[in-house]
């Protein structure tokens, strides 16, 4: 490995480490998850029922105005059980009060609820009356049919749940949910009658109020992914409440494709099927806590000339699985962070994820898929890396000659560069050739970092001693943090650093002995620092790629001969003298 190659690799590793600093097990059987989900749903329902009053104290006209008659009533709960979740919907607010996923567990392998506020719920409408009253439908009691029941649906079966709030004979609010047996997507339709002259600004908002609960053990890491977002005009708008005690807000006008609240692996996205007037995002981080609370809402117009306004929405509430959200045809996948749109995102979307999805049809273990993927990438880069290795061997053979040239022409830089160029050309070597394969792989490596860091495919999938390929494979936790290294020892990065050391040891180098000794230890150490906090899936990929590279290097070393080395000399070939032409015989 020549000086340019080593310098390039060192700079790349240093950039990766600095960038990281400033950026930041077996599954239970499905039946167990299902039973646990039902238990959690029943618990939520019991908690809500225990707080219910047969009739609330009548609300005053001053607080609710025209909505006062609906501010008291009896809360009734409906449970929906489909293939993917258990949901609880309440007649108070016609809101979703609980949704427990069946196929996903939290970091402690326990079921979790995607609705953080089981008492008030999350999905609602917000009105501002012309008198200045702020009305949240979660404070109002709706009527409906088939309430206080459990509905089970499978596959393509659907179930519609309807609520109605009558304010007067000519004024009402209707809300309808549509559930499908095999989908995380829930239909949410709103019909307003006779309200066009009663609302300030002739608009209302449909909102998801509440951050998604954190599901992973590393709350600080999850906080880096938590956010409220909107997609408008082909651009992603993010709201990140990163500082304690500070309120964050973002509001824009226009036709929004969706608004959403997410944590690291799950999302609640509101998708309008009609044109919107804009969106509003709000967020705040709790003091002394990594948890970030968010609100995301869509602004909808209520034209003064229309007596009845129908608006249709969908709520996607489930995992941030690329293939699943892509299939919604709503651009929700744009919220997934795959790095630079012009470089790493294409590698993630069109190379890594499709390859993993295809291989997963035949291989169920993602550890094996990563190893196969590393082997395939090695095959693709084999011709380039072989040519690079041979070029480095030639460079190593030329070092004595190059040193002699440097001494000979130390006072004539122009002549030195000319002679170096001639020798490189005659020997058929490229001084930068040793660094080229690594540089070409960097977009792929960075893309894999983003995929392994944020994709739910690897979450809670193990391999050998690794319990979860989406997090570091810690074998020892310190209980404190070492700067640049972390709070634990991960085994895969150590093995990977050993392979980096071995690869450098057997690779020809154009460095001096002192340079070689420094880089022989410094570069593996830098890679160890970088990968110790990386997802173990990424460390496994790089480990296996290095193993294949070491095997390739052994093969090249064993099949090379002296005839492969360049045959050049320091002195340039002398030019033949021109024969003087005579004027006579």
Swiss-Prot record:
This is Membrane protein insertase YidC. Gene3D superfamilies: 2.70.98.90. Required for the insertion and/or proper folding and/or complex formation of integral membrane proteins into the membrane. Involved in integration of membrane proteins that insert both dependently and independently of the Sec translocase complex, as well as at least some lipoproteins. Aids folding of multispanning membrane proteins. It is a multi-pass membrane protein. One of its GO terms (molecular function) is membrane insertase activity. The chain crosses the membrane at residues 5-25, 338-358, 362-382, 432-452, 482-502, 518-538. The lineage of its organism: Bacteria, Pseudomonadati, Chlorobiota, Chlorobiia, Chlorobiales. The keyword Cell membrane applies. Its main location: membrane. CDD domains: 5TM_YidC_Alb3, EcYidC-like_peri. Interacts with the Sec translocase complex via SecD. Specifically interacts with transmembrane segments of nascent integral membrane proteins during membrane integration. Belongs to the OXA1/ALB3/YidC family. Type 1 subfamily. It comes from the Bacteria. GO terms for cellular component: plasma membrane. The keyword Chloroplast does not apply. Keywords: Cell inner membrane, Cell membrane, Chaperone, Membrane, Protein transport, Transmembrane, Transmembrane helix, Transport.
């Amino acid at each position: 490995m020549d000086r340019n190659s080593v310098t390039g690799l060192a700079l790349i590793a240093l950039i990766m480490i600095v960038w990281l600093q400033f950026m930041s097990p077996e599954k239970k059987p499905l039946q167990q998850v299902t039973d646990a989900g039902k238990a959690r749903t029943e618990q939520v329902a019991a908690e809500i029922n225990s707080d219910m009053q047969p009739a609330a104290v009548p609300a005053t006209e001053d607080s609710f105005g025209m909505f006062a008659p609906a501010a008291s009533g009896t809360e009734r709960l409906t449970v929906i059980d489909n293939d993917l979740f258990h949901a609880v919907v309440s007649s108070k607010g016609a809101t979703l009060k609980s949704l427990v996923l069946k196929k996903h567990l939290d970091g402690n392998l326990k079921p979790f609820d995607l609705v953080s506020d089981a008492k008030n719920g999350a999905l609602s409408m917000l009105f501002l009356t012309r008198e200045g009253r702020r009305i949240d439908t979660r404070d109002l009691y709706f009527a409906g049919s088939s309430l206080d029941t459990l509905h089970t649906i499978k596959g393509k079966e659907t179930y519609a749940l309807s609520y109605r709030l009558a304010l007067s004979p000519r004024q009402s609010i209707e809300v309808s949910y549509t559930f499908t047996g095999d989908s995380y997507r829930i239909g949410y339709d709103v019909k307003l009658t006779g309200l066009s002259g009663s609302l300030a600004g002739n608009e209302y908002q449909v909102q998801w109020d509440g951050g998604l609960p954190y599901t992973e053990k590393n709350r600080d890491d999850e906080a880096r992914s938590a956010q409220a977002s909107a997609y408008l005009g082909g651009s992603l708008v993010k709201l990140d409440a990163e500082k304690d005690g500070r309120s964050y807000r973002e509001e824009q006008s226009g036709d929004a494709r969706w608004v959403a609240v997410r944590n690291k692996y799950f999302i609640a996205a509101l998708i309008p099927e009609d044109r919107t007037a804009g969106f509003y995002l709000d967020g705040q981080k709790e003091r002394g806590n990594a948890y970030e609370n968010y609100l995301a809402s869509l602004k909808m117009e209520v034209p003064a000339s229309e007596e009845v306004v129908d608006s249709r929405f969908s709520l996607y509430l489930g995992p941030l699985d690329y293939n699943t959200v892509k299939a919604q045809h709503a651009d929700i996948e744009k919220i997934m962070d795959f790095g630079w749109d012009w470089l790493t995102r294409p590698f993630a979307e069109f190379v890594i994820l499709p390859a993993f999805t295809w291989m997963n049809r035949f291989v169920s273990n993602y550890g094996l898929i990563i190893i196969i993927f590393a082997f395939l990438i090695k095959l693709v880069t084999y011709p380039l890396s072989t040519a690079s290795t041979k070029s480095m061997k030639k460079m190593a053979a030329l070092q004595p000659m190059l040193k002699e040239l440097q001494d000979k022409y130390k006072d004539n830089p122009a002549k030195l560069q000319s002679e170096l160029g001639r020798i490189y050309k005659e020997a058929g070597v490229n001084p930068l050739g040793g660094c080229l394969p690594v540089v070409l792989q960097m977009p792929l490596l960075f893309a894999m970092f983003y995929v392994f860091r944020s994709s739910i495919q690897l979450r809670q999938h193990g391999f050998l001693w690794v319990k979860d390929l989406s997090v570091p494979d810690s074998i020892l936790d310190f209980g404190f943090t070492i700067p640049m290294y972390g709070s634990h020892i991960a085994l895969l990065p150590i093995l990977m650093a050993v392979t980096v050391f071995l690869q450098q040891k057997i690779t020809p180098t154009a460095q001096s002995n002192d340079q070689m000794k420094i880089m022989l230890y410094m570069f593996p150490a830098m890679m160890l620092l970088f990968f110790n906090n990386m997802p173990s899936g990424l460390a496994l990929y790089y480990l296996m790629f290095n193993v294949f590279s070491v095997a390739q290097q052994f093969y090249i070393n064993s099949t090379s001969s002296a005839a492969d080395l360049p045959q050049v000399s320091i002195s340039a070939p002398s030019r033949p003298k021109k024969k003087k032409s005579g004027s006579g015989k």
